[in-house]
């Protein structure tokens, strides 16, 4: 690790605790301005290829040419983001050499130009490139890359394409000490149901393509008749805005059809009239009565149980499967989500929802996990052989759990998967045995050929938004993040007395020079606001290629 001489490069607009620790141990801080990640990443890549430091052997064996990246798509409409982003001319390349040619042709990726826009010392870009790829005594360094939300949520497609290409250039991917991935540890693990039919989506884009339904835009356009909101504040989250709150107000509270009776049939008739009149009916399912989605706009409240109040499985970002056991009864009428959904489904006339407990749900979902990155079906197979439930068997792995996909060896023991896309992994030569299922992603990448797609990452797709958003006049960049002191929105923490006593409010960190200029001192109460907040109106149709660009939306009055 870092304390044993590992070189660490941190790219972050702020000197966080992690940055300070890395610097203390000889690391490098790329102190970029917000949103300029793509420029700096591609500038690093440019230095690497200009000097011939790329991992040529890895690239030769594991990178697609154009035929490889196009294969498997057939001749139909490119109607999913994966398809059209892979084969779109702005992104697709003919292979590494074509990507290199494109990279070197972009003036904005010259180190001096990228450094100027990003507000960073050009020497840091040069050092980063050397650390990541320059051979020492004829031996290439092993480089791994880790990203998180600030990186891929700010310029999602562009930043992801750029960092993927850089990873390919340095040979990071699928080998011990040479991997690339995100750092998130979200507790997830649900099995997906049927996909939304994208060809039915109203979100039309140029050509014959359609985007997945954007529920914010659909609601803003007044088309949402019923919203079943589960576990999200919605109006305050992501693209939430006062504009969205006003629309909720219009469609619910301001609609003339309001419940004024305790009679069940009268309530049903009233809500149907509201929906038929162009209004919206809202169901809110959450562990708290959230303001305003729950206590102001919801017509029906489903109080939900949370972790500790029901036994269930989870899988985190590294596919680590674990059981979280119940240790406390849920308050009042609160029920686990699976129970609420099952009762709704049965009342709607659907079969197959007769679960007795959360283990029943887990066992039914096990077979649908086969071949996935969290495949846990063989845990269930082992459990049934031993006369146990799936939860009981998984519980034997304790706090550490087991990483999916999970396989059963010939002696009946279970084996997890340390890393996906492991190009060094040796599988059974004669194929999977018993109920085991092999997935291409175990030893290859998720393309038709099993190789990586190296893509372009044009700055022009983001630069119009960035140039509009960057501070003007006396404005400052403002970032929001997650701190352990007051986690996220305070959804849970603000209800904990010992947290609130120590941190009664969220805090703002500001550079001393900026604070002095504005007369701000430690302990002051501040209001952080912006006079310039872009928000999409009711547009769901795109005709020209530029219609969904930021500049195109602004020109159209959105």
Give, region by region, the residue ranges found by the protein language model.
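A cross-kingdom feature strongest in bacterial/archaeal respiratory oxidoreductases
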Residues: 1-22, 33, 206-333, 369-558
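Generic, well-ordered alpha-helical scaffold segments in large soluble proteins
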Residues: 1-4, 43, 47, 102, ...
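Long, well-ordered, tryptophan-enriched scaffold segments
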Residues: 2-5, 16-139
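Intrinsically disordered or highly flexible coil/loop and linker segments, enriched in small
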Residues: 7, 14, 50-57, 68-72, ...
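Alpha-helix capping and helix-loop boundary segments enriched in small/acidic/polar residues
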Residues: 29-36, 86-90, 98-102, 153-157, ...
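Acidic/polar loop patches that form or flank catalytic/metal-binding clefts of enzymes
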Residues: 54-58, 124-126, 142-145, 172-182, ...
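Conserved short loop/turn motifs at secondary-structure junctions
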Residues: 114-120, 147-154, 186, 232-235
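A glycine-rich, hydrophobic/aromatic-adjacent loop/helix-cap motif
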Residues: 130-223, 311, 431-432
